[in-house]
Amino acid sequence: MDEDEFELQPQEPNSFFDGIGADATHMDGDQIVVEIQEAVFVSNIVDSDIAVHNFVPDDPDSVVIQDVIEDVVIEEDVQCSDILEEADVSENVIIPEQVLDSDVTEEVSLPHCTVPDDVLASDITSTSMSMPEHVLTSESMHVCDIEHVEHMVHDSVVEAEIITDPLTSDIVSEEVLVADCAPEAIIDASGISVDQQDNDKASCEDYLMISLDDAGKIEHDGSTGVTIDAESEMDPCKVDSTCPEVIKVYIFKADPGEDDLGGTVDIVESEPENDHGVELLDQNSSIRVPREKMVYMTVNDSQQEDEDLNVAEIADEVYMEVIVGEEDAAVAAAAAAVHEQQIDEDEMKTFVPIAWAAAYGNNSDGIENRNGTASALLHIDESAGLGRLAKQKPKKKRRPDSRQYQTAIIIGPDGHPLTVYPCMICGKKFKSRGFLKRHMKNHPEHLAKKKYHCTDCDYTTNKKISLHNHLESHKLTSKAEKAIECDECGKHFSHAGALFTHKMVHKEKGANKMHKCKFCEYETAEQGLLNRHLLAVHSKNFPHICVECGKGFRHPSELKKHMRIHTGEKPYQCQYCEYRSADSSNLKTHIKTKHSKEMPLKCDICLLTFSDTKEVQQHTLVHQESKTHQCLHCDHKSSNSSDLKRHVISVHTKDYPHKCEMCEKGFHRPSELKKHVAVHKGKKMHQCRHCDFKIADPFVLSRHILSVHTKDLPFRCKRCRKGFRQQNELKKHMKTHSGRKVYQCEYCEYSTTDASGFKRHVISIHTKDYPHRCEYCKKGFRRPSEKNQHIMRHHKEVGLP
């Protein structure tokens, strides 16, 4: 076996140091056996020293350091005398120590191991480590008094794979992380020097935090090739009535600009409700004392940034498990009281986990070391000075309420934002949350599903306790006794209460369902509206349905009479005048009121009869006025220029001469403008920042900016990806994909799926025919309402037929 290599023999329980230095003092019959209790990362290190202080065993002739991890055999002999002499070991060994009854001081000089003569009685307070590289080692050691000293390594807990390359001694780095359960057991690494070849070079720094938790693992794919798995189980109490203590080492990222990132967080005896308490057996009593510890330190590698330990590759659950056992609780408590006065609570660190730090940008205030180098100091203390930190439970973040709705900001007056509630599915905005909630019923497929589902029925809930109570109700009833059956799904229940609850689930599911009419394409989210539609349109009392508007009638004659409204047909004509009507009853009323014998006065021109002479005189004025104003675009004639102008503007032009001063909206007639201005009274106007457009409604202003001043097309069709500026344009476009017949106007961009609406559009907008004509002056109108308004204004003395 070479001098600079270790031979790993996992099946060998004991390891002996056979090689004896020339200056070593021999003791007949005595032999040192070392048992190490955690995985050790070993590499070739030159000129590194480890000093362990204040080790005074009860029996100086017997020292046992136990371990239950790996079988490592180092064939070197170490001789001992009544007083430990200096021994040379030609191997690179790092052995962290744990002190139970007393402090331990040991100095290991690499490539040789030296134990000074006065190490047992001295009280040395400083040690030095010289390590150019870094190795993470989670160690836990305890010393037992036996006659023979054996170095034993077991692999019952952690399987460690150690790869040592003798040809590349500068690649694998070493650094020791010791989890020591003794109150004052501190490996002081203030003398550790880290060689920095370039001060301006950024370094990889990380926190290592140890906390008590379940077993875990470390997987490292770096040059060291180390894999540690700690998922196997361990007996919490050993044979000698001591219980081990499990400590985890977590890695936290640090700021590379800090000089000293080492530190300690100590947690005193945990409360009963703490889940991370570890029971330690007090040697003076049989009571188990639960305690907790968290330890962190830094890993600073300035020489091997790319080849050495790559902390960014380590997952969030990475840790090293340290087992600590056989500790004197009384000595620990006494030492903790002394050490409590020495701890500076102001030097406490804050930790940032890897999952929260995407880069090495987390600042942490470090403690300046004595020699200015990065500190590898690791403390595990039982003091209560920082105990209140552990008792402060972190505040739980409140889970966002599922009933909360997201808000958005739109442009308001003078650039001030206005909060609205947008629909995240179709983009429509609402002024209040209630309107948005009502609108969301139109998107039942996108409503949030409940988190917890019952496996026995359709019950769902967002609360875990509600599901638990519901499952308990299932346990009270036997499935064999279920006799009541649900009419909708066929499930059986034992009593009516369970069936009622089950039907509420069906009702809840149906609340978000779109209700579609069976006889036409009408659909709505509310059942009441569908019932009203069925009663008014498709009821058995109204079996005769109009194909144009869907209105129902009791008799075919009523439907035939109704269809004349859509066709404009007027088959009934007055025999005394040119009056025509679509309904015979209207014609009878006309004759009775206009051509009755009870009205002796009759017009000589139109043969209309009147009961009073004044009425006849006013009527004759209509015939006397000469209509000299002829429209250039049609056959319309007006008695004055104002009427002709009004006709041309409203019929033959798209200009709107009457403009609103507030919003610049145009109208054909002054009366329409007057009605519009009344809307603006008492409302604050919102000015567009890009033009002079003003509007009282901020939603209209938002649509104006999207349609006029932006080139973006935020509303896109999911099928053909065509973009639109406004939601209503997209809605019209979606009708082309629905499979329904679309009526497209050949004169403009108007389109609709309603045949009657399309017909009204063509007649009222793009034709010169005006089917609704005045009986007195033969003036035509697009709609009957316009004709009635005309008669009330100009033929008030005659009255409506």
From Swiss-Prot:
Name a biological process GO annotation.
regulation of transcription by RNA polymerase II
Give residues where Phosphoserine occurs: S270
Compartments where found = Nucleus
A Gene Ontology cellular-component term? nucleoplasm
The record's section on PROSITE patterns has:
ZINC_FINGER_C2H2_1, ZINC_FINGER_C2H2_2
Q: Which domain of life is it from?
A: Eukaryota
Q: Which SMART domains match?
A: ZnF_C2H2 (SM00355)
Q: Which InterPro entries match?
A: Transcrp_activ_Zfx/Zfy-dom (IPR006794), Znf_C2H2_sf (IPR036236), Znf_C2H2_type (IPR013087)
The UniProt GO MF terms for this protein read: DNA-binding transcription factor activity, RNA polymerase II-specific; sequence-specific DNA binding; zinc ion binding
Instruction: Quote the Pfam families the UniProt record gives.
Output: zf-C2H2, zf-H2C2_5, Zfx_Zfy_act
Cite the entry's keywords alphabetically.
Answer: Activator, DNA-binding, Metal-binding, Nucleus, Phosphoprotein, Repeat, Transcription, Transcription regulation, Zinc, Zinc-finger
Map the zinc fingers (C2H2-type) to residue ranges: 421-443, 452-474, 484-506, 515-538, 544-566, 572-595, 601-623, 629-652, 658-680, 686-709, 715-737, 743-766, 772-795
What PANTHER family does the record tag this protein with? Answer: CHROMATIN-LINKED ADAPTOR FOR MSL PROTEINS, ISOFORM B, ZINC FINGER PROTEIN
**Which family is this sequence assigned to?**
Belongs to the krueppel C2H2-type zinc-finger protein family. ZFX/ZFY subfamily.
Q: What is known of its domains?
A: The binding of ZFY to DNA is mediated by the interaction of the GGCC core base pairs with zinc fingers 12 and 13.
Q: What function does this protein fulfil?
A: Probable transcriptional activator. Binds to the consensus sequence 5'-AGGCCY-3'.
Protein name per UniProt: Zinc finger Y-chromosomal protein
Species this protein is from: Pan troglodytes (Chimpanzee)
